[in-house]
From Swiss-Prot:
It comes from Schizosaccharomyces pombe (strain 972 / ATCC 24843). Keywords: Nucleus. The gene is ecl2. Induction: Up-regulated transiently when the growth phase was changed from the log phase to the stationary phase. InterPro entries: Ecl1/2/3 (IPR024368). This is Extender of the chronological lifespan protein 2. It is found in: Nucleus. Belongs to the ecl1 family. GO terms for cellular component: nucleus. Involved in chronological cell aging. It comes from the Eukaryota.
């Protein structure tokens, strides 16, 4: 599973499944900050996931949609051009 990118929007992360709280809540709207369900937001806690959650994440992160891929590429190109 690729943990370098948010499983919701595809933005780069630092080893988390989500880039922001907003993306986390989009995937888990009923989660509170102290909810046990939300303990999977860090990659270090992946071993605690049930197979149900792992299957869900594999399906969502294995094949990015064409629009996500093109927006990631466009964002990368734009960031490289901005440096020039």
């Amino acid at each position: 599973m690729d943990l370098d990118y948010c499983i919701i929007c595809g933005k780069p992360t630092t080893g988390n499944l989500y880039c922001s709280r907003e993306c986390h809540l989009q995937d888990c709207p009923g989660c509170g900050s102290t909810s046990e369900q939300c303990s999977y937001s860090k990659s270090a806690d992946l071993h605690m996931l049930s197979s149900q959650y792992l299957d869900h994440f594999r399906r969502r992160s294995s094949m990015p949609s064409p629009s996500t891929s093109s927006s990631l590429l466009n964002g990368f190109v734009a960031s490289r051009l901005a440096v020039l």
